[in-house]
Each structure stands twice: as structure tokens, then as C-alpha cells.
Amino acid sequence: LNIMQKKPKVAAVIPFFNEQETLPVVINQTLPFADLIIAVNDGSTDDFLKHIRINERIVLISSKKNEGKGFSINRGMKKSMELNSDITITLDADLQHPPEYIPQLIEMLKYYDIVIGNRLRNLRGMPFQRILSNKLSSVLLSIKLKQVISDSQCGFRAYKTSILHDILPLSKGYEAETEILVNAKRKNYSIGFAEIPTIYTNRKSRMRSFKTIRGFLRVLFT
């Protein structure tokens, strides 16, 4: 069945950890483009619950402790399958990913099984070390997958929900987004890219460089 022949049911998975300032903004900006929001709380210790409203369109999943982004993505994807969505969107809770581009990602699912936001043509504001690590990881992953991967680390993605059971990540950290692509290529699923702007703020990144690199290399070479 071609999911684009009817109006698809869209679920947006938003993993978050201590994002009480930005989470409600992201949810409100995403609601016009998704039927369901699956907000995955990764052990937050702030007062985020005071800032969001849970209703029939906003589902909250919570972990008791901080498990990692990959763990949260896994839980969110499973919930999306459970709720019988046709399309699963993933995006970050820190306002880096503009939800108004969700329709463009969905449109490209006519041609691909996975569509990833490509930020690397829009580098304004991206810290230099992030540009370097992203380009290097994208080159290495392109070699591994025998396909040009423009932006391997972007978490702003659209998936056909029907393929999620084949590509769920086991990695708990940031490397999970790379693992998903490795799993997808092993199953011969197609991967496309849509150019998006990315908004970078001055706040300190939570990505621990050494741990992330080690996880990325483990995914790449196993």
C-alpha cells in the first residue's frame, strides 16, 4: 500500500532532557504538521511538566533516569508503531530543527524510505568542531554504506513507520542515529536528503565528544 495515496497519519517523536524552555515551543510549532506528538522524557530533572499539556494528541513517555538519545528514539519509534502511524518524524527539542520543513520531508517519502534533513549547505552558526566532526563522520559513513550520506548526524528525519521494526537502534547514545542508517542499508531501504536550515544557539552542546566518537566508530566497524 502506498502511504501517500491517502492522508498519512504522522507521529512526531521528540526526545528531550531538561528542555523546559524550548520543549513547549517545539511541540506547538510541530502540532500543525503532525497528528500525534510523542514526547520522550529522558530522565529530566526540571519542571517541564508545568510547561506542556498532555492531551489526546500529545503522548508522554518517561524514563526514570537519563539513558541517552538513542534509548529515547527507540522508545519513541516503538510507540509510533504501537499507535499505528504511517509516518514517523524525529526532531530535537532544542529548536535546532524547523518543524515547518516537515511537509518537505514527508513529500520526499514518495521516493525514499527515510528522508534526512541536510544542514551542511546551511552552515551559518554551526560550531566549527561540529562542522568538522559531521563532515568526517558523513564521509566515513558514505564509504561504509556505498552511498553519499550528506549529513549523518542530523536527527531531523522522516521514516515510513512500516520499516521501523527493521532499523530500531540498540545504541543508547548519539551514535544511534548512525546505527539506524547502517541498519537501513543492510535491509536495502532507500535514504534521501532534504535541504533544511538549522538554527544554532550559543548554548553548550551536551554531546560528549570522546564518548560519541567511540560509539560512532563501534557502530561503523561492527
Q: Model-derived features: where do they sit?
A:
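Short beta-strand/loop segment that forms part of the nucleotide-sugar
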Residues: 27, 35-44, 61-63, 91
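Acceptor/aglycone-binding surface of glycosyltransferases and processive sugar-polymer synthases
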Residues: 65-67, 71-82, 99-174, 200-219
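Donor nucleotide-sugar binding loop of glycosyltransferases
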Residues: 19-22, 44, 98
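Short beta-strand-to-loop acidic/aromatic patch adjacent to the donor-nucleotide binding site
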Residues: 85-96
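Cell-envelope/extracellular polymer assembly enzymes that use nucleotide-activated donors
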Residues: 9-11, 179
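Catalytic donor-sugar/metal-binding loop of nucleotide-sugar-dependent glycosyltransferases
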Residues: 148, 169-172, 182-199
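Short, well-formed alpha-helical segments that are part of the catalytic scaffolds
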Residues: 16-32
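A conserved acidic beta->alpha catalytic loop
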Residues: 41-50, 95
